[in-house]
């Protein structure tokens, strides 16, 4: 028997043992009993279909055909009563590898999104299914400079990378993205905290000057590597940014050693702009479609952003594109009275492996109210802490209206946190005793136990997810892979067949 077959058998046996342990009466009862305890402690009735549909129509009266929300999973052991993420809610997910987050969440959300949909990923899994699911909608835009989906690598779209930059604040946000990506790539040994602040300010000023004057991204790197700041300083003064212009003048007048270190730091942060293959996707090209973030957020188009280096050039570009889209969405929402006419759905799949967005935690505090519905998928809590630092992760987790754990994680501290908020139940035991005279007495003892202890959360069976909402509700749901939904599976498979015929 081959080694691979033995591995398959071993995996099946392990899965069977895990499921049997969960469904047995040990360690606090069966799955059904656990769910009943959760429902008693944290009822989730406020997020079912009827109430979600009513809420959706109230929030988006000019979005005909809008559904109740994004499916998270099904309640109970049978039937199709679903738990939804509403159109004013953002979610945070932690799913271990191979747990079905893409098939049960991202692909399904792509099909359910009533307007524009965007996703990120570092692999091809789910990408073709998303394209097939949305083939009856608007255009599909694929940003794939690292040739993950298309080996040819020729740009199929270009974008104004700094379209969202219009003042010092937005320039600082984009500079922070490049800093975050480059910091991970360089590691601690490649950073000098003494000059990080000035280097970031220099990069921000050059980004602002390039955006105001309509320069290409490569110009920013030329300014920084040459050490000559007269050109960007002049541009900034002409556009009324006298403070940033004065800052550039000050950097130019620093002692040689200090100035050299500041420029070296800024050059490291802008290193993504040295990759010509990436910059081509941000340079207008005859015959190549130009992506307009403002038009996208008000459309029913699909945007797929692919990158493979968490800390580096690809992450910097993908994250900056996200910044342009989210900035455009906020502008559109404000023009429409504070909320998008039709929700923008953004599933940041593999966010810990693709994206560097320092502002993500802050955005979660108000994006939902604007109809910008974001779902961020991490493989571990550690990924979130790496991306946002501990405080940022805690802010993101707390600000999320829906929090989902899809299993497959062995982080005891994280699981203890979930166990604590899930709560306890009163476990009653009876004992009997017989006196010498033959009399029999019964005593009842009550002991508080965790509804979901750490070991049970760690062994969460495949196809199940722990969910908690900001309304206090919490439960275990059955995840809904698109392939197990006959109508959706038929639609997507038909689209996949059509794509094969075109190829």
Language model region names:
Residues 87-88, 92-372, 443, 447, ...:
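P-loop NTPase motor domains
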Residues 2-5, 417, 475:
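Short intrinsically disordered, low-complexity coil segments enriched in acidic
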